[in-house]
């Protein structure tokens, strides 16, 4: 009998927590943890505060050190996305064409940013969901520039506060 395989799609908080909990609960099979971002998994809440302000780097935001994945025999596949799921054949195919067979499959993909249909210069419209999003936004920030934040939830207001503190003219 071949070794059991659990494929987890989504290497953020839910996916990492599931992978570690599987080991804690005694799962002895393979664990394949697939994440789109190239970085090790990190906490997202600081993106719109400490990371945007430059007070906290990505290394300080890691969910777990890289060694934890190795120590728990979790095959962390960063920079990969799943293109298709064959439920009948019990396999997933990634963007690089590689297929992984599974016995158990968990979808831990989280939310996606809702892109707005706004005219104008699309290269000047930014969203905050990933560390890369924040890095791209930070490249455009200069004191005195005008910024419009669309969204008055936690992330929008936190980002607005940080941008305002950094001498940008912010409208929410």
What are these regions (language model features)?
Residues 29, 126-129, 158:
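Catalytic cores of transferase enzymes with a strong primary signal for eukaryotic protein kinases
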Residues 41, 102, 115-116, 157-159:
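Glycine/Thr-rich phosphate-binding loops of Rossmann-like dinucleotide-binding domains
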Residues 153, 160-163:
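Hydrophobic alpha-helical segments that mediate membrane insertion or helix-helix packing
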Residues 85-86, 156-158:
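Short secondary-structure capping/turn micro-motifs that flank functional sites
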Residues 31-34, 81, 118, 154:
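Proline- and acidic/polar-enriched loop/turn elements at helix boundaries
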Residues 1-9, 62-150, 165-171:
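FAD-binding core/adjacent interface of flavoenzyme oxidoreductases
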Residues 2-75, 162-172:
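Beta1-alpha1 glycine-rich phosphate/pyrophosphate-binding loop at the start
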Residues 16, 154-157:
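Glycine-rich nucleophile elbow surrounding the catalytic serine of serine-hydrolase chemistry
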């Amino acid at each position: 009998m071949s070794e059991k395989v659990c494929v987890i799609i989504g290497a953020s908080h839910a996916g990492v927590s599931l992978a570690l909990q599987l080991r804690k609960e005694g799962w002895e099979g393979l664990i394949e943890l697939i994440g789109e971002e190239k970085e090790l998994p990190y906490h997202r809440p600081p993106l719109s505060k400490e990371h945007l302000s430059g007070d906290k780097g990505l290394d300080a935001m890691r969910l777990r050190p890289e060694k934890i994945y190795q120590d728990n025999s979790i095959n962390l596949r960063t920079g990969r996305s799943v293109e298709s799921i064959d439920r009948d054949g019990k396999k997933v195919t990634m963007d690089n064409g590689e297929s992984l067979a599974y016995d158990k499959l968990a979808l831990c993909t989280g939310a996606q940013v809702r892109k707005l249909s706004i005219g104008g210069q699309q290269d000047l419209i930014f969203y905050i969901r990933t560390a890369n999003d924040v890095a791209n936004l930070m490249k455009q920030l200069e004191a005195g520039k005008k910024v419009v934040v669309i969204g008055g939830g936690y992330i929008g207001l936190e980002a607005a506060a940080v941008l305002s503190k950094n001498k940008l003219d912010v409208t929410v």
